[in-house]
């Protein structure tokens, strides 16, 4: 039986064997607080590759030490971090998947002893510290850090880079009028609020010619915040700059109530795909093969990002293939366990 979910997908010169992407999820497991990969990361990501995920995207990886969400985040701010990341991509490639990295800066959500940086001195909520408004020089330094991280990503063997522009972290803070109250060239109009991301994309394009994704929060869930309509223009600009795919999440730039239900963010992937004419990834409570297949069949997205379901079961692709009646090519080491895998949890 044919399946959209298990059909290949090519972006530039990178071909994914199927449409399943491991969504980036922080593991907070750099135990020595130095940004280094640990054995846990090798097992964690290698297992999902062996489980037949097409693209394994590692967690938000900080481009600067002060840009970590926590002191146990992975980092890519120094050449000494390349070796561990290269071991990770080797594990992923050896188990049949492509490897992606999400480059990130936590902005005002950095929970470290050092000052948190943000476009404006506005805390996320009343319990978090007031961030320091970034100077122009700090902005330029951060843009350079993203570029240097892209160089290291190439050296570490990653096939895809994703820029983290979602979930209330630094880039998202610049994009949203709720967190960006600047009156200089980086704030005010949508064009000026987009400038920080524009310059990051331009800087990465100077050193990286592989597939480039951007994760966005397509809805601020606030009456004065951004909606998916606002992101149509943003994503059109991203496409003009050569971004290949928009990973469509939502929320977390300010505290907000979100009505969560199966596939609740697919609407954003569909809307941006249709109106910005760019490839999209759907993410958020996608938990079955049938659900993922329908999203692709309905042309609502091009890739399916699976998060918590892959934490629950690293062999989700095998279960999805059985569910869809698709014969998945298994690693030879698993051939002694033929037959259908139970979908019971």
Swiss-Prot record:
InterPro entries the record matches: Aldolase_TIM, NADPH_DH_bac, OxRdtase_FMN_N, YqjM-like
Name the positions where substrate binds. 28, 164-167
Keywords on record: Detoxification, Flavoprotein, FMN, NADP, Oxidoreductase
Catalytic activity reported:
A + NADPH + H(+) = AH2 + NADP(+)
**Under which main EC class is this enzyme filed?**
oxidoreductase
Keyword Cell membrane on entry: no
Q: Does the keyword NADP apply?
A: yes
Annotated positions binding FMN: 23-26, 60, 102, 215, 307-308
Annotated Gene Ontology MF terms? FMN binding; NADP binding; NADPH dehydrogenase activity
Q: Name one GO biological process term.
A: response to toxic substance
What this protein needs as a cofactor is:
FMN
The record, for Pfam families, names: Oxidored_FMN
Q: What is its EC number?
A: 1.6.99.1
Q: How does it assemble?
A: Homotetramer.
**Which family would the database say this protein is a member of?**
Belongs to the NADH:flavin oxidoreductase/NADH oxidase family. NamA subfamily.
Purpose of the protein: Catalyzes the reduction of the double bond of an array of alpha,beta-unsaturated aldehydes and ketones. It also reduces the nitro group of nitroester and nitroaromatic compounds. It could have a role in detoxification processes.
Q: Which NCBIfam families match?
A: PRK13523.1 (NF010047)
HAMAP family associated with the record? NamA
Q: What is this protein called?
A: NADPH dehydrogenase
Q: Which organism is it from?
A: Bacillus thuringiensis subsp. konkukian (strain 97-27)
Q: What is the lineage of its organism?
A: Bacteria, Bacillati, Bacillota, Bacilli, Bacillales
């Amino acid at each position: 039986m044919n399946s959209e979910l298990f059909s290949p997908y090519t972006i530039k010169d990178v071909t994914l064997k199927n449409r399943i992407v491991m969504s980036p999820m922080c593991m907070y497991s750099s135990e020595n607080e130095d940004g280094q990969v640990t054995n846990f990361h090798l097992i964690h990501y290698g297992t999902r590759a062996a489980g037949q995920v097409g693209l394994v995207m590692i967690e938000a990886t900080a481009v600067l030490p002060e840009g970590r969400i926590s002191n146990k985040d992975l980092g890519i701010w120094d050449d000494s971090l390349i070796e561990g990341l290269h071991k990770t991509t080797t594990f992923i490639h050896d188990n049949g998947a492509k490897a992606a990295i999400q480059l990130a800066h936590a902005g005002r959500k950095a929970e470290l002893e050092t000052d948190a940086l943000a476009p404006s001195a506005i805390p996320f909520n009343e319990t978090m510290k007031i961030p320091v408004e970034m100077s122009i020089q700090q902005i330029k330094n951060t843009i350079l850090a993203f570029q240097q991280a892209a160089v290291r990503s190439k050296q570490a063997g990653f096939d895809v880079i994703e820029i983290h522009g979602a979930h209330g972290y630094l880039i998202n803070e610049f994009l949203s009028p709720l967190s960006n109250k600047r009156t200089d060239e980086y704030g005010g109009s949508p064009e000026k609020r987009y400038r920080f991301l524009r310059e990051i994309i331009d800087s990465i394009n100077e050193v990286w010619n592989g597939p480039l994704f951007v994760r966005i929060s397509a809805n601020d869930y606030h009456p004065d915040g951004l909606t998916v309509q606002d992101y149509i223009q943003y994503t059109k600009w991203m496409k003009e700059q050569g971004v290949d795919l928009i990973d469509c999440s939502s929320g977390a730039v300010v505290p907000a109530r979100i009505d969560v239900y199966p596939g609740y963010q697919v609407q954003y992937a569909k809307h941006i795909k249709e109106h910005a004419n760019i490839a999209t990834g759907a993410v958020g409570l996608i938990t079955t093969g049938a659900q993922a297949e329908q999203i692709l069949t309905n042309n609502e997205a091009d890739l399916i990002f699976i998060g918590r379901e892959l934490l629950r079961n690293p062999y989700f692709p095998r279960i999805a293939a059985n569910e869809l009646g698709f014969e998945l090519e298994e690693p030879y080491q698993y051939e002694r366990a033929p037959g259908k895998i139970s979908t019971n949890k």
